[in-house]
Amino acid sequence: MDKKASRLRRATRTRKKLQELGATRLVINRTPRHTYAQVITADAQVVASASTLEKEVRAQISNGGNKEAAQLIGKLVAERAVEKGISKISFDRSGFQYHGRVAALAEAAREAGLQF
């Protein structure tokens, strides 16, 4: 089993558990060049999202694949979720290690008002 298959296996396991709980979750995805985040309800509706591909985000950052960009995405997605009335969520790191960009996004989301 290679690294990607292991990550996807962890992600599937986590998503299944969160689905059973019926929790609203903050899902992240990262690529070498970009970072993406979505708040998804228990019935699979996307409530809020943010990514480094958005025009307003691109204007503020020079590179979409670093911690500064992840912090901005975390802050944006949290503000958008709180605006829609969602403050308590579960963090779905999509099998990625809680380190670097993933941790930076999570901390920024916590500071902006999300509880997890």
Swiss-Prot record:
<dbReference type="GO" id="GO:0006412">
    <property type="term" value="P:translation"/>
</dbReference>
<dbReference type="GO" id="GO:0008097">
    <property type="term" value="F:5S rRNA binding"/>
</dbReference>
<comment type="similarity">
    <text>Belongs to the universal ribosomal protein uL18 family.</text>
</comment>
<dbReference type="Pfam" id="PF00861">
    <property type="entry name" value="Ribosomal_L18p"/>
</dbReference>
<keyword id="KW-0694">RNA-binding</keyword>
<dbReference type="InterPro" id="IPR005484">
    <property type="entry name" value="Ribosomal_uL18_bac/euk"/>
</dbReference>
<dbReference type="GO" id="GO:0003735">
    <property type="term" value="F:structural constituent of ribosome"/>
</dbReference>
<dbReference type="InterPro" id="IPR004389">
    <property type="entry name" value="Ribosomal_uL18_bac-type"/>
</dbReference>
<comment type="subunit">
    <text>Part of the 50S ribosomal subunit; part of the 5S rRNA/L5/L18/L25 subcomplex. Contacts the 5S and 23S rRNAs.</text>
</comment>
<comment type="function">
    <text>This is one of the proteins that bind and probably mediate the attachment of the 5S RNA into the large ribosomal subunit, where it forms part of the central protuberance.</text>
</comment>
<keyword id="KW-0699">rRNA-binding</keyword>
<dbReference type="GO" id="GO:0022625">
    <property type="term" value="C:cytosolic large ribosomal subunit"/>
</dbReference>
<keyword id="KW-0689">Ribosomal protein</keyword>
<protein>
    <recommendedName>
        <fullName>Large ribosomal subunit protein uL18</fullName>
    </recommendedName>
</protein>
<keyword id="KW-0687">Ribonucleoprotein</keyword>
